[in-house]
Amino acid sequence: ILAVCLFLMPLIHEPLDRTVSLRASIRPRVFVPRDGRRLFVAVAVVYLATWMVGCFFQSFSAPIAYTCFGAASPFAGSIILALAMAPSVLGGPAVQKFHPKKALAVSFAVVVASTAALALFVATGAELAFMAACAVFSFSMGACLATALRMLLLEVNVLQVSAILASINLVAYA
């Protein structure tokens, strides 16, 4: 599929005129909108919080399955990782019709609550409850990230999109 996409890329019409050279377009541009600095900080907090827990799952799903729940099969760790990541794709579309500020506040509160529940269920060895909390966390993480990004993108024009995305990803990966 990736090879087909690679060969089809040159055939896709780019709606924007080329304004910079290829060399300049490869260099990341950091941009924070003057009027959206507080929003940028809020989005950065959302990204960092959700990505950190997501990275935790990517690194420690198998050890959690073995150490906390006694599952020796790699399948258990895979299920934990899948439940912690896959439902996130449903979060954004589920909240797109709601007011962005309210959707972000509610979804982030659910992220915090589900993260606390994950810690509780690991400590108590409640495997099924942990799996359910993984799915709730993932869904709310997707809602948070999609809503936060939508709010940030509404603050910039189309020529600033790549710069704002580079900036928020720089914060997330730093």
Regions found by a protein language model. Give the residues of each.
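Transmembrane alpha-helices of Major Facilitator/SLC transporters
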Residues: 76-100, 111-114
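C-terminal transmembrane helical hairpin of 12-TM major facilitator-type secondary transporters
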Residues: 102-146
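C-terminal membrane-cytosol helix-exit motif in multi-pass small-molecule transporters
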Residues: 2-20
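Hydrophobic/aromatic end-of-helix segments at the C-terminal termini of transmembrane alpha-helices
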Residues: 57-65, 148
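Loop-to-transmembrane helix entry
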Residues: 67-86, 163, 167
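A late C-terminal transmembrane helix in Major Facilitator Superfamily
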Residues: 138-143, 149-174
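Helix-to-coil boundary motifs at intracellular loop junctions of multi-pass secondary transporters
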Residues: 64-69, 97, 151-156
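Pair of pore-lining "gating" transmembrane helices in MFS-fold secondary transporters
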Residues: 36-57, 131, 135-139
